[in-house]
Amino acid sequence: NVDGMRMSVALTYLSIARHRLNLTIRGEVFVRKVRFDDRKAIGVQVESQGDIFNLDAEEIILCGGAINSPQLLMLSGIGPEQALKDLDIDLVKDLPGVGKNLRDHPSAFLLFESCMDQVGDDPKAQQVGMRFTTPGSDIRNDMQMSPIFMTSEHRPDTIPLDPDKNYLGFSVALQKALSNGEITLKSSDPTEHPTLFYNYLDHPEDLRRMREA
């Protein structure tokens, strides 16, 4: 927001609405699958505090995101017929496209030693980002570049860092990838995470554009 705070759905909406009498917020409720009567969705099967039960309603809005949405559809019997049969999931609808065309934004974090005596630490300057079209690309604004300096146990330093020197970091991210992957189920157990095949940079044009950036 204008104060430099990273906003979320909880901060933006729930914090001002949680005291409404017609609103109940309950955590730790796990959706196992969508329930069908023939081919009509009538509710969901959920698990909460060790109990498994059904919630049926005229309207249920289920927001599973890019990963859990196809996972729940397949667990519920909607997806590639043979894959569901192999896991003994009752078929509701053969829909081969469920779980396909998974796309993400591959990125590279670059770290450099600075030739300047001092690197600026103005927070506003560090929030600058740039979208641009990679040379030779037919897709406009397909690349994003931003200043970033981030290290952790998951992303260790690429070069030894000297506390007496200054460094610059950049992030280059492909925002409109052509490579695509898929999501597949490991089992019919909804608590088991699905397998994700991202196929990053599988398309030669993605690889070329990342090199150009």
Question: Locations of the language-model features?
Answer:
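FAD-dinucleotide binding site
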Residues: 1-7, 11-16, 22, 31, ...
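Conserved redox-cofactor binding core of oxidoreductases
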Residues: 1-49, 109-113, 120-121
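Rossmann-like flavin
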Residues: 1-8, 83-96, 191, 195-205, ...
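Generic recognition of stable, solvent-exposed alpha-helical segments in well-folded globular domains
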Residues: 12, 67-71, 79, 125, ...
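Glycine-rich loop(s) and the adjacent beta-strand/alpha-helix scaffold that form part
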Residues: 33-34, 44-122, 188
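Short acidic/polar mixed-charge low-complexity motifs
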Residues: 40, 49-53, 179, 192
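FAD cofactor-binding and catalytic pocket of flavoenzymes
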Residues: 108-212
